């Protein structure tokens, strides 16, 4: 899984392809370990924000160098949303943060009143000393529906750590009515202190 996110259909294709081959999960794990040891990729663990514990589910992998990734796949896929998420991950690591992927378990009633359990994802849980930030990477926020989708996991977190959306949209840095900071990717990359504003 050497990308920040894979589309659902791509995941199914990969799973089916691997099942048809004679490659074992242990072999895949070894290759991923080799890639990590050679500093091609880095893994981020999943962290249950409410339960305050790491989850033994698949990790997410990020490339150290997106140029190498793009060259290796012959520049066939350029998914800007995934690339931006990878850039944010790399910048956070460069600034010294430990970075995990957040999971927020929720129980919600559907239209019929039946309770369903879901896991909402927070792209990054960043820790440095006593500072913690929850960060969502949103390539664009074209409408209120997309903004609501990005804010939803934050609203289910019951602590006072800072919650931030980083977007490619050229918006001024601002807080919304829930205290969630929105900052554009350019300000984030150029101003190491922008998360503290």
What do these predicted regions represent?
Residues 1-37, 43-44:
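Conserved helicase/translocase motor-coupling segment
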Residues 27-197:
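A cross-kingdom feature that marks ATP-driven nucleic-acid transaction machinery
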């Amino acid at each position: 899984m050497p990308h920040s996110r894979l589309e659902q259909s791509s995941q199914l294709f990969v799973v089916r392809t691997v099942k048809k081959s004679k490659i074992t999960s242990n072999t895949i794990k070894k290759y991923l370990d080799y890639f990590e040891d050679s500093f091609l990729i880095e893994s981020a663990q999943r962290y249950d924000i409410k339960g305050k514990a790491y989850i033994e589910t698949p990790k997410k992998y990020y490339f150290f160098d997106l140029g190498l990734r793009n060259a290796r796949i012959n520049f066939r896929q350029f998914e800007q949303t995934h690339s931006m998420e990878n850039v944010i991950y790399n910048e956070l690591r460069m600034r010294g943060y430990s970075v995990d992927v957040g999971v927020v378990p929720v129980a919600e009633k559907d239209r019929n009143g039946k309770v369903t359990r879901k896991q909402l994802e927070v792209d990054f849980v960043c820790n440095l000393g006593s500072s913690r930030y929850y960060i969502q990477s949103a390539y664009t926020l074209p409408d209120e529906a997309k903004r609501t989708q990005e804010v939803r996991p934050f609203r289910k977190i019951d602590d006072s750590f800072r919650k931030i959306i980083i977007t490619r949209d050229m918006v001024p840095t601002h807080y919304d009515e829930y205290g969630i900071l929105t900052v554009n990717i350019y300000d984030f990359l150029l101003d190491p202190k922008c998360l503290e504003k």
